[in-house]
Amino acid sequence: MKKNYIFYTLFFLFSFSINSQVVLGDGDILNSNVPIEAYYGYSYSQTIYKSSQINASGSITGVSYTATPSTTLTTSGQWVVYVGLTEKETFESTSDWIPISELSQVYAATAEAPTTISEEGVVTITFDAPFEYDGSSNLVIAVEENQDGYDSSSDDFYSTEADQIASIYYYSD
């Protein structure tokens, strides 16, 4: 039986009168294929975060994902990140995509400035422009990785198991 995973080992960087972070999940599962699948040449994922899990409103200025310390992004560094608001709480199926036209591109890496990972295995994405989150809608974050090449099959990110489909993904060579 296919397990459903939500990619919760993620920090939302909110801007209020003081800076704050929202941490979701405990990150106890590896290889859920989100936010990217580094072992393939192309990957795309979408994850829904419920407003009750975020419990804040304001400007989102970035996200962070936690990977295994040995993970590299040598040939998986050209990430494009999209964010949007949705009334959906879960995906109905693994093909129930939220149209990209309903999302805003907030980050795009290039060959000259690829997405990088720290020695501790943290990928921090600082958005090109803040995304205004209303605090009442659910949030969807989509991550596309389209750099030619393949990293190791052991390059994995942490996630948390969920009862319903909160993340969907696609990958190919």
Named regions from a protein language model:
Residues 30-39, 72, 100-110:
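Surface-exposed, low-complexity/disordered Ser/Thr/Gly/Pro/Asn-rich loops and linkers
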Residues 4-16:
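Sec-dependent N-terminal signal peptides
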Residues 14-43:
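Boundary/junction segments of secreted and surface-exposed precursor proteins
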Residues 55, 77, 82-163:
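Aromatic- and Gly/Pro-enriched, solvent-exposed loop/edge beta-strand patches characteristic
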Residues 22-30, 54-57, 75-80:
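N-terminal/edge-of-domain interface segments
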Residues 40-54, 122-126:
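Short beta-strands within extracellular/lumenal beta-sheet-rich domains
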Residues 58-70, 141:
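A short beta-strand element within beta-rich, extracytoplasmic domains
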Residues 165-173:
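PGST-rich, cysteine-poor low-complexity/disordered linker and tail segments that act as flexible spacers
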